[in-house]
Amino acid sequence: MNYSLPRSLSLALVLLLGLAGCAKKDATPSPSVPPTTTVTPPVDPHLTYLKLLADGTTNQALPLQKAIDSCSAAGGGTLVLRKGTYMIGPIYMKSSVTLRLDTLATLLASPNMPDFTVNGKVVNLINGPGGAIHDVTLTGAGTIDGNGAPWWAAFQANSALVRPRLIYITSCQNLTVSGLTLTNSPSFHLVPSQCQNVVISKLKIIAPSNSPNTDGIDPANCNQVSITNCTIDTGDDCIAIKSGRVNGALVDACQNLTVTGCTFLHGHGLSIGSETSSGVKNLTVSNCTFTGTTNGIRIKSEPGLGGLIQNVNYSNISMTGVTNPLVINMAYALNPNNSYPADIPSVSGMTIDHLTVTGAKNAGSLVGLTTLPIQNLTLSNLTISAQTGLVMQNATGVVMSNWVINVTSGKSIITQNVQGTGF
């Protein structure tokens, strides 16, 4: 069978061929234009963008929890929340799950306080599941907001009120928390408890200076913890390293920790304690700045809550406008826990090197127990400007070198029951 093209289509083909022929005969060829290549990024099968309702008022805990559970059950991956405010109640992280909050993505705690009572107990905003887990990450440039104001007000009216933490992860191997802004927790902001290999970096932790018990980062009975380049501005301890008993039993010490490159604004400084019954050892703090905090370097504990604190080292520390730059207080609450009379706090092997302090109220107060003095304390390269001097009591093996303590009233150093050299 013979086919013929319609006349209009035949004319169009002739015209196109003619134009092509003209282009070939052009004496001045057009410059060569490189072809445009469109690259389609590979699809990451482990990356899931969640489509939750971002109206800031509808509780999204259930769909978020389902996504976490499914992701972990499938072998793990990354769940991403894009720009928006996602209101949630308590959620539980699972193994091999990364939760990423992109810029302007906010997880906002439900304002409904009963949402945080489960089976008669107060639970936290972001929890571990209660058993051992591994490879959990919270990251991104977004915000986790604890919506703490109603809790703070309720606590002022009832100091026995138990309040949620913002993030409380227990028994996790390989925990990473990075990049986020954590703010307005009802109580502590970030608590890794009995975790192994914890990496915390580039966090901003912010709460009003008068918000009660809003600690920044509180590692408890953890091993291998790195805290780097964080800015913490809260109403209580910026960092508090703890090692209390767990269900009444002594457990592993909180050990092998580094804190470096951090900035502390307001709050109560960098503390060890007050719970130290299981011990704290091998802490290195370096290149940190304190501005306007109540305390700088602080160790606080008491009989009934105490244990051995050993091999703790601080270097290259700068403080401005800090009320109490150096504090060791082994009778912190003056309220001994008679349940564990053998849990006596002690400090052995502490060094502070290259410390610069300006505008302090007190140079410091380093006071051990009369029955168990501070042992082996080395202070070197100190430059301190304060209203009153450095008080040391109940300490042995104190070595001081290359120090300048300028005070406006009294002696630079006041000692009682102290043995050592250089002061």
Pin down the residues of each PLM region:
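Bacterial Sec-dependent N-terminal signal peptides
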Residues: 1-33
